[in-house]
Design a protein with these regions (language model features):
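Surface-exposed aromatic
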Residues: 32-38, 66-67, 95-105
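Conserved catalytic neighborhood of penicillin-recognizing serine enzymes
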Residues: 32-65, 148-164
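Active-site-proximal beta-strand/loop segments in catalytic clefts of secreted hydrolases
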Residues: 28-30, 57-60, 68-69, 98-101, ...
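Active-site SXXK
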Residues: 1-25, 115
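Short, glycine/proline-biased beta-turn/loop segments that scaffold the active-site neighborhood
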Residues: 16-39, 134-143
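Active-site catalytic microenvironments for nucleophilic, acid-base chemistry
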Residues: 12-16, 71, 121
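Soluble non-cytosolic domains of exported or imported proteins
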Residues: 1-5, 43-51, 55-62, 73-81, ...
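Penicillin-recognizing serine hydrolase domain
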Residues: 75-166
């Protein structure tokens, strides 16, 4: 769920004009080496911000989160500190971020209550980007065709679910 805070920070950067959807960001070795769910990025890639948004939402890309963090703040550590600060300003009093992806780490916590607050802020503060959360697949460069589908099983149940994260 930490990825939602990373997206909040990225949507804010878009609204402030610090990046655009077509801005390309470099991929570091740290991002390439990230484990878990990824976009399969490598150091030769320069994905656009829009591709990174889709990679985080649809593919749950941990590597994409690091690219965003480094692109906006220089380092993932600096970005995580900014996530916590911004979260406090939004009312997230029970969450502390130590990385951009939510990868298990000591001191990294997010409460269900704070998740609800953040979800509401995402929908209300950035309605123009909400459409990304309803995407059911993202075949990024056809790198892993079997990995292109959204990990949110609620999207395909026909119950009216239209997004955010699982």
């Amino acid at each position: 769920m930490s990825k939602l805070m990373t997206l909040y920070m990225l949507f804010e950067a878009l609204d402030e004009g610090r990046v655009q959807l077509d801005t390309r960001l470099p991929v570091s070795t740290k991002a390439r080496q990230m484990q878990g769910s990824t976009m399969f990025l490598n150091e030769n890639d320069r994905p656009t911000v829009e591709e990174l948004i889709k990679g985080i939402i649809v593919l749950s890309g941990n590597d994409a989160c690091i690219v965003v963090a480094e692109g906006l703040s220089g380092t993932e550590d600096a970005f995580a500190r900014q996530m916590t600060e911004r979260g406090r300003a939004l009312g997230l009093t029970e969450s502390t971020f130590v990385n951009a992806s939510g990868w298990p780490a000591e001191g990294h916590v997010m409460s269900a209550h704070d998740l609800g607050i953040l979800g509401l802020h995402l929908v209300q503060d950035f309605p123009e980007y909400y459409k990304f959360f309803a995407l059911t697949e993202f075949p990024f460069d056809n790198r892993a065709p079997a990995n292109r589908f959204n990990r949110n099983p609620l999207l395909d149940l026909g119950i009216g679910a239209d997004g955010l994260k699982t």
